[in-house]
Amino acid sequence: MNPLTHAERQALGRHARKQLARSAHADFKRDICPADPLALLAESMRGRVARLVPVKYQRMASSPFGFFRGAVPIMAADLACHPNTGLMTQLCGDAHVENLGAYAALDNRIVFDLNDFDETIRGPFEWDIKRLATSLILAGREAGIRKVDREEAVATFIRRYRRSMRRFSNMPVLELARYQIHRLAHIGPMPAIFGQAERSTPLRLLEKLTEPVDGSAAKPVAKKIAAKKVAAKRAVGSSAREAEHIGAQPRRFRSLPPLLERVTGADARKVLAALDQYAKTLQPERQHFLAQYTPVDVAFKVVGTGSVGLRDFVVYLEGHARPAHSDPLFLQIKEEPASAYARYLPDGAAAWTHQGHRVMDGQRAMQLTSDPFLGYTTIDNRDYLVRQLNDHKAGLNLGTLVAANLHGYADLCGELLARGHARAGDSVSISAYLGSGPRFDEATLGFAHAYANKTEADWDALRRWLKRNPKAAAS
């Protein structure tokens, strides 16, 4: 229960301006952040699978935005050595333009929201804003979008965040808890994202990741069905057609090293045994659904950029439909170290005894609708998050990004991030701090430019280091 009145919460937000003026958010002083970025990066690699560390370096060296995606430990240190507002909420922790995406809700709707919470933790609300704003600059540069359009996208994002937070601060609690954004289908790149999500069925993932047990080539899936037809028939018709084309033979994971490798023997038994503990973290009715699936095979998978080198297993399960593989479920069992922000926050490192539990709770707090199979488990004293690998998931394609789409997408990012922060924090205090004018917006735009430039310098330093140490990127 919140013991403060609405007026007291507003006063708390206004008082925070004395601790950190809104105009001060423009400051990024590299000289007061003594940590060596590459040393922080190397430290974050400790405990990871050594043979995969070069893969992470390769992905980070591909572009400044690729570097940014894998450099949360660096940005966490840089944010922490500057003053903050002290207005805490649940952070996404890795808020950037590719960490929002579409996925299937339990009621079969395709929804769109923040969707990566490996770094989630309670922290100053502005840290998420600064990271996402910087990502808009870097993504815009990578897509070849003009500076004026990049700046307008960042301004649009922050303005929408501020105005949405003001709206949420005056909204009844249950209305906020249920708040949905209904204009999604008409925003910038969203039609393409939703079309991709409709096509990204479990059966298509089955064909991509598995093969018949005898090793013969799988029959190709029929031509892609138009998005509208898939939307109308996804529950019955399209699934039946896809299953028919895949065939009736038993299946197992393909071997595509180092990105996908089958796990067998004692190692596979450890992973499967961990599903029992995981099941206890699900709600009772979802435990019932899970119990109707039978594990078939286990693999080790490399995903993303920031997570490369962490232990990441995939379990292929089959349901009761016939043939059994026409009812696949893929569970990702993903190692979760402590959040990169934890060391810089009061009690951050001690707040959670299980890092998978931390991620699950942070995700549920910020999302309107979460993966119905979201849970956690432990393998060999390491903490893991469990979720569906891909159930109608889709996201932004930087290769097709244009200025008009970036503006609309930035606007959506602002509203979704504000909703997540309002659900898990004090919207009244945050809104009172931000105020009704553009002072915070303009300052944060300045920060985003400065930090994007700093990221490019760090990226260049990584590339030069890899040239001097070619074995570090030799996978």
Regions found by a protein language model. Give the residues of each.
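Acidic catalytic cores of enzymes that act on phosphate-bearing nucleotides/polynucleotides
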Residues: 197-224, 228, 232-307, 316
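Conserved ATP-binding subdomain of kinase catalytic cores across diverse folds
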Residues: 4-92, 97-201, 225-231, 278-475
